[in-house]
């Protein structure tokens, strides 16, 4: 009996030891989990649509392992810019911040694949995607004249009977950059001569971006000069107009990211930048959100950057004064010329 009691005691001790070992293992696991801590927070200021930026940041956050989670706080309020870690915006604002010394250098692996035209010379901001100017051509008009008759910017003046609609080029940053990019590529005199050629065909200089899209779709215009981002959200299989990006290239708005000088979230922001540039998920999201934007690395890590020769950017009108003077010249020489424009 004594041996039996001793045996039971040994078994009890083994059981207690096993239970304690399990508890220690679980506690160690919990400690490791807690050591990961709460998700790091990255504050983003953006001039783009908040829903789109939230979708982009959210998809990146979902792709991270549990112990490397990042939470993004997104704001489009200008008074919160200085508290942000990074800026996602058009290149004009990013360049202004770089010149002002507000940004720090970005050491992102995939930014090295971008040509010099798509990033700051000191790499204080990099382009993530771009928005090209396009010709939105009414399907019925295209069938009448033949689709092959309209492939280039130079083909437009030859469509003598075409009714064209476009935004007023002196209204906002996007339209002024269209004018600046076209003038930078063609030369200002040549650009003004081109716009003077098509001036008699323009039925309306629209105040709102949706107007050219609507008029080309309804047949009130044959050709709309607009942005891909303005059209893409409305595209469906039966849409009565199609997007044409001229083969030789087109004015583009560049959108990118800059890391603010005071930010301590370099590692997290750079991981996000590399993901945006290389990931097929990021490229898919540009489509599924109907943003209309195009990636600067169309094949991500497996290919080269977009052909920079077809991206017309503002390389000449760098100061605000120069940009506004160009818009004023267009307004005086082209916009106010009497060509029978609809009064709206």
Each model region followed by its residue ranges:
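Early extracytoplasmic/lumenal segment of secretory-pathway proteins
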Residues: 30-99
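A beta-strand-loop signature enriched in Asp, Gly, Thr, and Trp
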Residues: 229-258
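A bilobed periplasmic-binding-protein/Venus flytrap-type ligand-binding module shared by bacterial periplasmic
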Residues: 136-141, 253-265, 285-286
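Extracytoplasmic ligand-binding site segments that recognize negatively charged/polar headgroups
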Residues: 39, 47-48, 79-84, 90-213, ...
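A ligand-binding cleft/hinge motif common to bilobed small-molecule-binding domains
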Residues: 92-99, 217-240
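Short, low-complexity disordered leader/linker segments with a strong preference
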Residues: 1-41
């Amino acid at each position: 009996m004594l041996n039996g009691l001793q045996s039971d005691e040994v078994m009890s001790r083994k059981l207690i030891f096993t239970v304690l070992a399990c508890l220690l293992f679980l506690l160690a696991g919990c400690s490791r989990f807690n050591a990961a801590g709460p998700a790091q927070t990255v504050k983003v200021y953006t001039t783009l649509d908040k829903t789109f930026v939230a979708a982009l940041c959210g998809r990146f956050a979902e792709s991270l392992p549990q112990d490397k989670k990042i939470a993004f706080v997104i704001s489009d309020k200008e008074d919160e810019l200085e508290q942000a870690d990074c800026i996602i915006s058009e290149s004009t604002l990013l360049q202004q911040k770089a010149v002002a010394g507000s940004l720090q250098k970005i050491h992102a692996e995939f930014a090295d694949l971008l040509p010099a035209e798509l990033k700051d010379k000191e790499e204080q901001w990099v382009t993530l995607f771009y928005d090209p100017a396009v010709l939105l051509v009414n399907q019925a008009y295209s069938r009448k004249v033949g689709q092959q008759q309209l492939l280039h910017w130079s083909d437009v003046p030859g469509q003598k009977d075409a009714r064209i609609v476009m935004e007023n080029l002196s209204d906002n940053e996007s339209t002024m950059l269209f004018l600046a990019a076209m003038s930078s590529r063609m030369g200002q005199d040549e650009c003004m001569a081109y716009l003077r050629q098509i001036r008699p065909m323009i039925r309306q200089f629209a105040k709102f971006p949706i107007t050219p899209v609507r008029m080309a779709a309804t047949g009130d215009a044959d050709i709309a000069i607009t942005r891909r981002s303005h059209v893409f959200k409305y595209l469906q299989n039966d849409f009565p107009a199609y997007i044409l990006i001229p083969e030789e290239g087109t004015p583009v708005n560049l959108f990118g990211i800059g890391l603010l000088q005071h930010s301590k979230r370099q590692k997290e922001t750079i991981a996000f930048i590399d993901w945006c540039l290389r990931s097929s998920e990021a490229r898919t999201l540009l489509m599924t959100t109907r943003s209309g934007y195009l990636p600067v690395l169309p094949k991500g890590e497996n290919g080269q950057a977009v052909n920079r020769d077809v991206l017309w950017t503002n390389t000449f009108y760098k100061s605000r004064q120069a940009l506004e003077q160009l818009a004023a010249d267009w307004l005086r020489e082209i916009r106010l010329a009497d060509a029978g424009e609809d009064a709206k």
